[in-house]
């Protein structure tokens, strides 16, 4: 009987500790330079870039500006980094980025392929996040 009561109390405590108000995901506010993003949904910004490539900057603004970092890079469905370890600079044949404070400078290299390229960047993480989708035209 005591075991059942203890189990019931444990379940109730677990359920009460899960609050959607405490677990609200908040989009990081960004200022952009050199690229025009459109809002896809509350957390996702999307942009089209030319085949020739582009250079642009993102700067975290507002209350959660200090949460700005690139935590995930996916290109055409392939993860490029270890998402568990935010890094301040990264490069590959696709281009590069470098972070300085709350600003991240990106360079997207020319697309030499015959297919469009899809870049997906996760900025921030946890409860403070912004997803970027960049679609690059094909050659």
Spans of model-derived segments:
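Sec-dependent signal peptide recognition
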Residues: 2-8
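C-terminal motif of bacterial Sec signal peptides marking the signal peptidase cleavage site
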Residues: 14-17
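Bacterial signal peptide processing site
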Residues: 19-22
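C-terminal edge beta-strand
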Residues: 24-25, 33-35, 104, 126-139
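Post-signal peptide N-terminal segment of mature Sec-exported envelope proteins
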Residues: 28-46
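Surface-exposed binding patches on compact interaction domains or structured appendages
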Residues: 51-103
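Short, hydrophobic beta-strand segments
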Residues: 102-112
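A short beta-strand micro-motif common to beta-rich folds, especially ectodomain repeats
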Residues: 113-126
């Amino acid at each position: 009987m005591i075991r059942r009561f203890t189990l019931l109390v444990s379940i109730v405590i677990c359920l009460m500790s899960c609050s959607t108000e405490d677990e609200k995901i908040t989009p990081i506010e960004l200022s952009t330079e050199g690229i025009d993003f459109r809002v896809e949904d509350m957390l996702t910004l999307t942009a089209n870039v030319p085949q020739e490539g582009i250079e642009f900057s993102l700067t975290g603004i507002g209350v959660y500006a200090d949460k700005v970092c690139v935590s995930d890079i996916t290109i055409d469905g392939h993860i490029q980094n270890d998402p568990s370890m935010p890094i301040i600079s990264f490069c590959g044949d696709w281009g590069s980025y470098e972070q300085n404070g709350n600003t991240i400078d990106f360079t997207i290299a020319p697309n030499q392929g015959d297919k469009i390229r899809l870049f997906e960047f996760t900025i921030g993480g946890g409860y403070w996040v912004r997803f970027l989708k960049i679609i690059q035209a094909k050659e």
